């Protein structure tokens, strides 16, 4: 929608990706690029997972009231998109800086996905193996990774009056 609000001016997007795959429509929710998804797809997800939503939401989706600009919208012909940094490039820069300080640096992946707790436990096990056995890397070293973890919230919170606190990174660090 931001790209359309700027019309008729051309829009230049300089994006720094923080998501696996570097999909422009996903980076920062893609406010200046076309959205390939549809309201019909959203309805299909609601149905597939039996997600209850207010009737007004279901009606708005069914009528396409919240449809977003698609790739064939004429204004996107005046828009340019440049990916200026990726997760891998960020990890490589961090590794280079660690090496500058004399540490061996190892990039595990830029596309790790899964529950934050599980991913943290895997990282902790790897760190223990390095410290205790010198495998798969010699200590001391810097282990770097990136990706997109998730946190599954309980269906019924312990206290529904208290707002949820923290997030994926907090969950990862507490589990580490």
Label the model's feature ranges:
Residues 21-26, 70-76, 101-105, 145-153:
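Short acidic (Asp/Glu) and glycine-rich catalytic loops that position anionic groups and cofactors
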Residues 1-26, 31-34:
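Glycine-rich, mobile lid/loop segments that gate access to catalytic sites or pores
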Residues 8, 12, 34-122:
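Accessory alpha-helical/coil subdomains and C-terminal extensions
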Residues 94, 123-127, 173-176:
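Buried hydrophobic packing segments
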Residues 103-150:
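Long, well-ordered mid-to-C-terminal structural blocks that present hydrophobic/aromatic surfaces
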Residues 50-55, 133-139, 157-159:
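Short, glycine- and charge-enriched coil/turn segments that flank and shape catalytic ligand pockets
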Residues 35-51, 156-176:
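Gly/Ser/Thr-rich active-site loops/lids in small-molecule metabolic enzymes
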Residues 24, 115-116, 151-155, 163:
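Short acidic/glycine-rich loop or secondary-structure boundary segments that cap or lie
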């Amino acid at each position: 929608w931001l790209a359309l609000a700027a019309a008729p001016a051309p829009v230049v997007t300089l994006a720094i990706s923080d998501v696996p795959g570097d999909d422009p429509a996903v980076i920062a929710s893609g406010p200046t690029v076309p959205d390939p998804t549809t309201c019909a797809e959203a309805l299909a997800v609601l149905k597939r997972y039996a997600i209850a939503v207010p009737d007004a939401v279901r009606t708005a989706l069914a009528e396409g009231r919240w449809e977003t600009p698609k790739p064939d919208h004429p204004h996107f012909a005046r828009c340019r998109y440049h990916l200026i940094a990726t997760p891998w490039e960020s990890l490589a820069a961090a590794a280079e800086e660690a090496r500058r300080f004399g540490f061996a640096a190892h990039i595990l992946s830029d596309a790790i996905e899964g529950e934050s707790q599980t991913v943290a436990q895997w990282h902790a096990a790897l760190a223990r193996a390095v410290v205790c056995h010198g495998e798969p890397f010699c200590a001391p070293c810097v282990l770097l990774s990136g990706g997109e973890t998730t946190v599954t919230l309980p269906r019924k919170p312990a206290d529904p009056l208290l707002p949820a606190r923290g997030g994926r990174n907090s969950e990862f660090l507490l589990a580490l």
